[in-house]
Amino acid sequence: MKKERKQTPYIELSKVNKFFGITKALEQIDFQIFSGEVIGLVGPNGAGKSTMMKILTGVLPPTDGKIIVDGTEMKRYTTKEAKEAGIACAYQDLSLCTNLSVYENFAMLNVEHGMFTKPGWRKTAKKETKELLEKYFPNNQIDIMKPVERLTLAERQIVEICKTLMTDNLRVLILDEPTSALSTDKANQLHKVVEELSARGTSVIYISHKLEEILKISDRIVMMRNGKNSGECDPKEIDTVQLVEMLGGSGAAKGKQKINRENAAKGDMAVSVKNYTGKGLYNINLHVHKGEIVGISGLAG
């Protein structure tokens, strides 16, 4: 169900540019997120999604443009200001200390560190870690005593997400490819967490190449391409095929490009698919010759 928006967005980027030398990573980006809104952020690799998230979390300063938080333009905006605004990110490349145990990673955030730490802090940290993991990902079977480096990638992803959810004043949660290693069951548990956060007024920016997931969970979809806004849409009004087309994927289906196969053809035709349309596929043409190595790439979905 579409959420009613307040007049003022909680976070707004206005005409934001980001340059790395002469390379233009972001160009005239306008981005708004309202309280309780779930935004699906999509685009190919290199579109500028991660750069924009680093600006939102204060890790990178914009070259120019405005960052507005709760109606106030920020004259200074670093990780400190982002944290005070309640913005937290569960990173795709993970921010965990791999040499520490699971509970020690959590303890780094919720235990007062000093010369005279309270007695029994380890026992408390272990209990809180177990409770937190079970709250968001029931039956996760994660051994909190294990060093993070010995966990599976899926377990690390769960720990990263739960650690981010510990943020006391959480107002905006950024999830960067959060289900890339998760099973369907664990992904569904995360979707439930996102729904609960949204109902409480916490905004979520959900970055994923899994387009069916984006359509399922988002209130609004924002698209990026080549460092620019390339449009937005209502997920209730489109399907996966239409979203792929909006992202620029239709060119491959509609274009009647001629490919010179003289160099590629190392032998006789091994597989040939012509104008195939089926479930989730549209007008597929594929020709593979014996001895040929064919790379296939694209967005999930």
Task: Give the label of every model feature segment.
Residues 2-301:
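Glycine-rich phosphate-binding loops of nucleotide-dependent enzymes
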